[in-house]
Amino acid sequence: MATINQLVRKPRKRKVEKSAVPALQACPQRRGVCTRVYTTTPKKPNSALRKVARVRLTNGYEVSSYIGGEGHNLQEHSVVLIRGGRVKDLPGVRYHTVRGSLDTQGVQNRKQARSKYGAKRPKKA
């Protein structure tokens, strides 16, 4: 425990909390342009071909962003909106693309959790 005299000379340091999503710069989402759209494999013990886009953001950052859902229409030069949220089994992927906004289409034939995938409500028969 520090004495009062020591604290007067040198106050306590505040702990700086490190952001999990630094490229967003305290914004909820950011717009960017796809520079590369590709698939990659997850860490052990999982196995799949995960869809990922390399995105150059409006603030100059370049990040990897996961494309959720079944099927997508993204290619190079597509304009996308990204949000925070990492993918646990893909190292270095700390952002998600927002489905159903800008050039990203929503998932087709999606019945449940539609708002997460930008899918419209299906028509009644």
UniProtKB/Swiss-Prot annotation:
GO biological process, one term: translation
Annotated keywords: Methylation, Ribonucleoprotein, Ribosomal protein, RNA-binding, rRNA-binding, tRNA-binding
Superkingdom assignment: Bacteria
Gene Ontology terms for molecular function: rRNA binding; structural constituent of ribosome; tRNA binding
Region ranges (Disordered): 100-125
Positions with biased composition (Basic residues): 111-125
Modification 3-methylthioaspartic acid occurs at: D89
InterPro entries membership: NA-bd_OB-fold (IPR012340), Ribosomal_uS12 (IPR006032), Ribosomal_uS12_bac (IPR005679)
GO annotation, cellular component aspect: small ribosomal subunit
Entry annotated with the keyword RNA-binding: yes
SUPFAM superfamilies to which the protein is assigned, alphabetical: Nucleic acid-binding proteins
Function statement: With S4 and S5 plays an important role in translational accuracy.
Family, as annotated: Belongs to the universal ribosomal protein uS12 family.
HAMAP family in the record: Ribosomal_uS12_B (MF_00403_B)
Assembly: Part of the 30S ribosomal subunit. Contacts proteins S8 and S17. May interact with IF1 in the 30S initiation complex.
Protein name: Small ribosomal subunit protein uS12
Organism: Thioalkalivibrio sulfidiphilus (strain HL-EbGR7)
